[in-house]
């Protein structure tokens, strides 16, 4: 565990997110401020299982998984900002808008995920997300997540 309250290592991420291999797409939180922003990292390895078919001979990290990585970073920020969920509550990824892909992400890249809290109303929070490689925007989108009780 870390003593720096603005970073989170994988053990702490696993306590917050339900995702596990091969679908956990956040390796470490570099910095965050509750209710404001979060910066995280996803190290892209050639060993990712989807590279076998996306695409043979020209591996490219699937765009939908870049969005999922940003959504997971958003979930971590939501958990750290709003606190633990009550029994029977879940966070749901509710919407994505204005998604744009600017450059491919390839094995060996380190993807920096930056998410910013925009506003929250009646349990629905809006965020802005950007994924960057070497300072260059790979993807950007607006996202929403909803805090709801299980039916």
Swiss-Prot record:
Active site: 54
A GO term for molecular function: (3R)-hydroxyacyl-[acyl-carrier-protein] dehydratase activity
Subcellular localization: Cytoplasm
Top-tier EC class: lyase
Keywords: Cytoplasm, Lipid A biosynthesis, Lipid biosynthesis, Lipid metabolism, Lyase
GO BP, sorted A to Z: fatty acid biosynthetic process; lipid A biosynthetic process
Gene Ontology cellular-component terms listed: cytoplasm; membrane
Pfam families xrefs: FabA
InterPro entries: FabA_FabZ, FabZ, HotDog_dom_sf
Homology family: Belongs to the thioester dehydratase family. FabZ subfamily.
NCBIfam families: fabZ, PRK00006.1
Protein name: 3-hydroxyacyl-[acyl-carrier-protein] dehydratase FabZ
Gene of this entry: fabZ
């Amino acid at each position: 565990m870390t003593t720096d309250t603005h970073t989170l290592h994988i053990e702490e991420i696993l306590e917050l997110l339900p995702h596990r291999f091969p679908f956990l797409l956040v390796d470490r939180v570099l910095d965050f401020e509750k209710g404001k922003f979060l910066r995280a990292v996803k190290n892209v390895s050639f060993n990712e299982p989807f590279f076998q078919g996306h695409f043979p001979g020209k591996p490219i990290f699937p765009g939908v998984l870049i969005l999922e990585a940003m959504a997971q970073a958003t979930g971590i920020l939501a958990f750290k900002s709003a606190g633990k969920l009550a029994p029977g509550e879940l966070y749901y990824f509710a919407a994505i808008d204005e998604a744009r892909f600017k450059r491919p992400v390839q094995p060996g890249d380190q993807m920096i995920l930056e998410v910013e809290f925009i506003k929250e109303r009646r349990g629905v929070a809006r965020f802005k997300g950007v994924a960057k490689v070497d300072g260059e925007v790979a993807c950007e989108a607006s996202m929403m997540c909803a805090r709801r009780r299980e039916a």
